[in-house]
Amino acid sequence: YVNLYGGIDMDTMQGLKRTHYCGDVEGIGNEVVVGGYVQKVRDLGNLIFIDLRDRTGIVQLAFDDSTDREIFEKASDCHSEYVLMAKGVVRERESKNTAIKTGNIEIDVKDLRVLAKAQTPPFEIVDDTNVNEELRLKYRYLDLRRKVLQDNLIMRSKIAKVARDYYYEKGFIEIETPMMIKSTPEGARDYLVPSRVHHGKFYALPQ
């Protein structure tokens, strides 16, 4: 354990390396290591199920009577948006979930690491969250964890790559210089940097 961030005990990733993203887990009997955010915890007493989420999807972590007691208790203390690393064996899921890609399998957890704890978020991190835009913008870093917004960012990245690849193939060179970037009204804050060439003048560098 390490003791950081106000005395909260958290685990390290030492000895674990991710083998699969949550949405890509497959192969019954395979040993896998996954990491991500806690989407939901279902504590049924002698059974605990945790939906673990990353940008590719969700996979269910399972804890039962065969689980090491320390790991079981650690799972029972988990809450929404905790960051976990889990190692275990893929097995068939008794209660199938056709709504997700990994709905036919689950991970029988043998090792669980709590990498970061979290307070209860101001709104639920789901695509159909019912919250006003002002609150979403205030907690933009949480809002961007929702898949619908991540899909937009991924699409934007792909479009930008296609455009760049096209111009690179045509012999264009991409440059970024503050003298060719115009400040925008109501845009990001500008930083004023003195010019070493034109004394008494400044560059306005958009944040």
Regions found by a protein language model. Give the residues of each.
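Class II aminoacyl-tRNA synthetase catalytic cores and aaRS-like
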Residues: 1-207
